[in-house]
Amino acid sequence: MTFNPNIATHTLEAEGLRCPEPVMMVRKTIRTMLDGEVLLVTADDPSTTRDIPSFCRFMDHQLLGAQIDQLPYQYLIKKGLA
Protein backbone atom coordinates (compact mmCIF):
# COMPACT_ATOMS: atom_id res chain seq x y z
CA MET A 1 0.00 0.00 0.00
CA THR A 2 1.32 3.43 -0.94
CA PHE A 3 1.47 5.87 1.95
CA ASN A 4 -1.43 8.26 1.35
CA PRO A 5 -1.99 10.88 4.07
CA ASN A 6 -5.10 12.11 2.22
CA ILE A 7 -7.14 9.20 3.61
CA ALA A 8 -6.89 10.63 7.13
CA THR A 9 -10.07 11.91 8.75
CA HIS A 10 -8.15 13.37 11.72
CA THR A 11 -4.66 14.79 12.19
CA LEU A 12 -2.31 15.08 15.14
CA GLU A 13 0.86 17.14 15.03
CA ALA A 14 3.26 15.85 17.68
CA GLU A 15 6.46 17.45 16.41
CA GLY A 16 8.69 18.75 19.18
CA LEU A 17 7.22 16.37 21.75
CA ARG A 18 9.29 13.65 23.39
CA CYS A 19 8.43 10.22 24.76
CA PRO A 20 5.91 9.48 26.18
CA GLU A 21 3.95 12.54 25.02
CA PRO A 22 3.36 11.56 21.35
CA VAL A 23 1.78 8.20 22.23
CA MET A 24 -0.25 9.77 25.04
CA MET A 25 -1.63 12.32 22.57
CA VAL A 26 -2.38 9.59 20.02
CA ARG A 27 -4.33 7.68 22.67
CA LYS A 28 -6.28 10.79 23.70
CA THR A 29 -7.11 11.69 20.09
CA ILE A 30 -8.17 8.16 19.10
CA ARG A 31 -10.56 8.02 22.06
CA THR A 32 -12.56 10.87 20.45
CA MET A 33 -12.75 9.15 17.04
CA LEU A 34 -15.30 6.74 15.63
CA ASP A 35 -14.35 3.15 14.82
CA GLY A 36 -12.79 2.93 11.36
CA GLU A 37 -11.70 6.57 11.17
CA VAL A 38 -8.06 7.25 10.27
CA LEU A 39 -5.59 9.42 12.17
CA LEU A 40 -2.52 11.00 10.56
CA VAL A 41 0.22 11.52 13.14
CA THR A 42 3.22 13.71 12.40
CA ALA A 43 6.14 13.41 14.83
CA ASP A 44 9.90 13.85 15.01
CA ASP A 45 10.77 11.80 18.10
CA PRO A 46 12.75 8.69 17.05
CA SER A 47 11.03 6.64 19.77
CA THR A 48 7.75 6.91 17.85
CA THR A 49 9.12 4.48 15.26
CA ARG A 50 8.91 1.82 17.98
CA ASP A 51 6.18 3.18 20.26
CA ILE A 52 3.40 3.87 17.75
CA PRO A 53 3.45 0.40 16.13
CA SER A 54 3.52 -1.16 19.62
CA PHE A 55 0.61 1.02 20.73
CA CYS A 56 -1.43 -0.05 17.69
CA ARG A 57 -0.82 -3.75 18.35
CA PHE A 58 -1.58 -3.46 22.06
CA MET A 59 -4.76 -1.40 21.57
CA ASP A 60 -6.06 -3.32 18.50
CA HIS A 61 -5.76 -0.40 16.09
CA GLN A 62 -4.42 -0.87 12.57
CA LEU A 63 -1.23 0.85 11.48
CA LEU A 64 -2.08 1.45 7.82
CA GLY A 65 1.29 2.91 6.97
CA ALA A 66 4.35 4.72 8.22
CA GLN A 67 6.78 7.10 6.58
CA ILE A 68 9.96 6.97 8.66
CA ASP A 69 12.60 7.58 5.99
CA GLN A 70 12.81 11.30 6.73
CA LEU A 71 11.62 13.84 9.27
CA PRO A 72 8.92 14.46 10.14
CA TYR A 73 7.79 10.88 10.57
CA GLN A 74 4.18 10.20 9.59
CA TYR A 75 1.84 7.41 10.66
CA LEU A 76 -1.65 6.44 9.50
CA ILE A 77 -3.66 4.71 12.22
CA LYS A 78 -7.12 3.24 11.69
CA LYS A 79 -9.12 3.09 14.88
CA GLY A 80 -10.07 -0.46 15.79
CA LEU A 81 -13.49 -1.61 16.88
CA ALA A 82 -14.29 -0.76 20.47
UniProtKB/Swiss-Prot annotation:
Belongs to the sulfur carrier protein TusA family. GO terms for biological process: tRNA wobble position uridine thiolation. Gene3D superfamilies: TusA-like domain. One of its GO terms (cellular component) is cytoplasm. Transmembrane segments: none annotated. This is Sulfur carrier protein TusA. GO terms for molecular function: sulfur carrier activity.
